Every structure is written in structure tokens, then in C-alpha cells.
């Protein structure tokens, strides 16, 4: 689906955006710590962090619908010419819904898990993929009870699958295994969100200023507290004359008017700290200004707006947040200290706090 015609007049721009895509792939392949891995450690604990990011025993976490839409909007907003290199549009996804859609997506997940890029084959048969995917979707993983396709057998659903929309959907996914599949409905929504974003003058200016260098999908690699780290920044302004750098981060959400809570619950303050530190090291002597969020509604109901952060917000990212209830959200510095402790001691099945207190701690008190 060609959203932008690649004519001679925009060939240079297209090549530049392809270069951005190549750098992004290089970024994804780099195993350095980033906001997502540090957030995983904080939210899910050291063992999950180890299995997912060190031992690579876990599949990457599935993005939420809002995050999927955010990535699509980001592409159409900042590197639209590369849409065909990143995404493919399938029509079947609009007709395959509910548990049927879940089954096809689980099949594709297993296909990718066993896929050999060199010869284009899978290490298990299609029948094995279908049966395993069906069981994964049908049965509750804890109780073993049927929660989807109740009373059905995998053989009966295979008959429905063959020659129908489900098979078309699956085939379209497999044919584009290296790309992200989206529906026409999703693309239309993303395009409308982009229009809404650019209709706000102060946001339109971010992507069209002439007095600064503008970089989209800007990769950073650096070291901090003994760790190799990385960040992929949505948009960066650099003013070499006045020596300042401004970072912008696009967030789409179902609840844009309560974004302060989203910043807390999704631990975006950690991302602010990671990116700020990377920019500080990349641009010594420059003023690194606190992040500005570009906040857009995933359903395109609420007008987009800019959410500014301050040096106080940035301090929270490094040092943590203490809530009136007593709940403490750890900052980047403390989390890196704890991660280093786990590496030094090769202990991943408990936390540093529990281990150093001989397996006895006082539980957090909430509600006061």
C-alpha cells in the first residue's frame, strides 16, 4: 500500500527515511539496556528480567492496541515513505474477529518462533502449529479449563479454517513475516490521528521548524553506571548556535486527559531519565531541556496537546517518586544499582532487598 508516491522529487527524502529504518533495525538488534528492559525489571522482578532480556527465554511482550496505534501514527507522522518497508495491510483482519482472530495470531506467533529465515521453513509442521495454537487459545493456562472454542475440537475448527477468511488472514501474515500487519481500519484511524496532530499549530511547528536540526527516530548509545544503554528518541531538536537540545516523545493513549497518571503507571519517568542522560553524554556543553510529550487520543476523540515536563519531573526519573500513601516508585539510579547487584551475585530468583534482609521484610502499607 503506497501511502506516498516515491517520485523523483522526494527520492532524497525517501532514502533518508530508509536510512532511519536501517538504524532502527540496528537499534533493535543491540542488546544494551533500555527503558523497556529496566521497566520490566521494576514491574515484574529480577527473574522475569533475566529470562526475557538475558537468557532470551521469553517472547517480546505484546504491545497494547494503544501502543500499536502509537507506533503506526509515529511512522506516518515522521517517516511516512517507509510505511511499505515496515507494514503490510491485510483485509482479512477486518473480517476475522474475536477468538478466531486470537487463534490466527497465536498460530503466527508459533510460526515466527519456529521460522528459519535462511530457507523459509519452520521446524514443526503446520498441523503441529495449528493444534498447539488451538490449545493455547482454548485452554486456561492455569486451570486447563476451556475458555474459548468451548466444546469444539481442533479438527472441527481446522475445517472452518481451511479455505476461509482465517486461512487468508494467516497466509497474509506469513507472507510478510518480517513486517507488522495492520488493517485498513487501523491505517485510516492512524492517518486521521496524524491530521489531528498536525492541525494543532504548536505541534505542527515541532515537525516543521526551520531554525533547528530536526531528527526523527534518533538512536542513542551510551554508558551509564557501568551499563551499556540505548534509546530511540521519537523527535529531537538541536540548536547548535544556542547550544540546546529538546526531546519530544509521541504518546497515544485511551486516556489523554489523565496523562499524568499514565506517566506514573507506565513509568515514563524512567524513559525521561534514560533519554536525558543519553543526550547529555552525546552533546556535552549543551543544555538538555526536559522532555515535551505530544499526547494524542488513540480513538481520535480528544484534541492532541503538548505536555511539558520540568527539571523536577526529570529528578523523579533519576531518584524515584515517593507517594503520600507511602508507595515508592524507584528511580533509574536505584534500579541500575539493583540490576548490577543481581549480575554481581548471580541471584535472580529473589530481590536484593529480600536477600539482604535474610528473606524477611515489612510489606508496603497502602490506603492511608
Residue ranges, per PLM feature:
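Short catalytic/ligand-binding loop motif for oxyanion handling, primarily in non-cytosolic enzymes
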Residues: 85-86, 256-258, 301-303
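Short amphipathic alpha-helical face segments that pack within enzyme cores
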Residues: 72, 234, 270-278
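Metal-dependent nuclease catalytic cores that hydrolyze phosphodiester bonds in DNA/RNA
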Residues: 2-230
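Extended, compositionally biased low-complexity polar/Lys-Gly-rich tracts
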Residues: 166-197, 216, 247-259, 265, ...
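Secondary-structure boundary elements
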Residues: 206-210, 237-245, 280-289
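Hydrophobic/aromatic-lined pockets within catalytic cores
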Residues: 77-82, 224, 237, 252-255, ...
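Non-catalytic protein-protein interaction segments used by genome-maintenance enzymes to assemble
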Residues: 218-269
Amino acid at each position: 500500500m503506497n501511502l506516498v508516491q516515491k517520485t523523483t522529487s522526494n527520492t532524497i527524502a525517501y532514502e533518508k527515511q530508509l536510512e532511519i529504518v536501517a538504524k532502527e533495525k540496528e537499534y533493535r538488534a543491540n542488546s544494551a539496556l533500555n527503558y523497556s528492559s529496566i521497566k520490566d525489571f521494576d514491574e515484574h522482578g529480577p527473574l522475569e528480567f533475566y529470562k526475557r532480556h538475558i537468557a532470551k527465554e521469553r517472547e517480546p511482550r505484546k504491545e497494547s492496541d494503544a501502543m500499536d496505534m502509537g507506533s503506526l501514527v509515529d511512522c506516518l507522522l515522521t517517516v511516512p515513505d517507509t510505511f511499505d518497508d515496515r507494514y503490510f495491510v491485510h483485509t482479512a483482519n477486518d473480517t476475522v474477529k474475536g477468538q478466531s482472530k486470537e487463534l490466527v495470531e497465536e498460530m503466527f506467533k508459533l510460526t515466527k518462533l519456529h521460522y528459519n529465515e535462511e530457507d523459509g521453513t519452520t521446524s514443526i509442521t503446520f498441523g503441529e502449529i495449528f493444534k498447539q495454537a488451538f490449545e493455547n487459545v482454548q485452554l486456561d493456562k492455569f486451570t486447563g479449563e476451556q475458555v474459548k472454542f468451548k466444546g469444539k475440537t481442533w479438527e472441527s475448527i481446522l475445517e472452518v479454517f481451511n479455505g476461509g477468511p482465517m486461512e487468508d488472514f494467516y497466509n497474509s501474515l506469513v507472507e510478510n513475516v518480517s513486517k507488522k500487519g495492520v488493517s485498513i481500519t487501523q491505517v485510516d484511524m492512524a492517518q486521521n490521528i496524524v491530521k489531528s496532530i498536525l492541525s494543532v499549530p504548536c505541534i505542527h511547528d515541532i515537525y516543521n521548524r526551520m531554525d533547528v536540526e530536526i531528527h526523527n527516530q534518533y538512536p542513542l548509545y551510551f554508558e551509564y553506571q557501568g551499563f551499556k544503554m540505548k534509546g530511540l528518541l521519537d523527535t529531537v531538536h538541536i540548536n547548535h548556535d544556542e547550544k540546546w537540545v529538546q526531546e519530544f516523545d509521541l504518546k497515544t493513549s485511551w486516556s489523554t486527559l489523565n496523562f499524568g497518571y499514565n506517566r506514573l503507571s507506565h513509568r515514563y519517568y524512567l524513559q525521561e531519565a534514560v533519554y536525558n542522560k543519553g543526550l547529555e553524554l552525546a552533546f556535552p556543553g549543551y543544555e538538555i531541556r526536559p522532555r515535551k510529550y505530544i499526547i494524542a487520543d488513540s480513538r481520535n476523540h480528544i484534541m492532541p496537546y503538548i505536555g511539558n515536563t520540568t527539571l523536577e519531573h526529570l529528578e523523579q526519573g533519576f531518584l524515584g517518586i515517593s507517594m503520600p500513601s507511602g508507595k515508592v516508585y524507584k528511580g533509574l539510579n536505584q534500579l541500575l544499582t539493583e540490576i548490577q547487584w543481581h549480575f554481581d551475585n548471580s541471584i535472580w530468583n529473589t530481590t536484593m532487598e529480600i536477600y539482604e534482609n535474610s528473606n524477611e521484610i515489612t510489606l508496603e502499607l497502602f490506603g492511608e
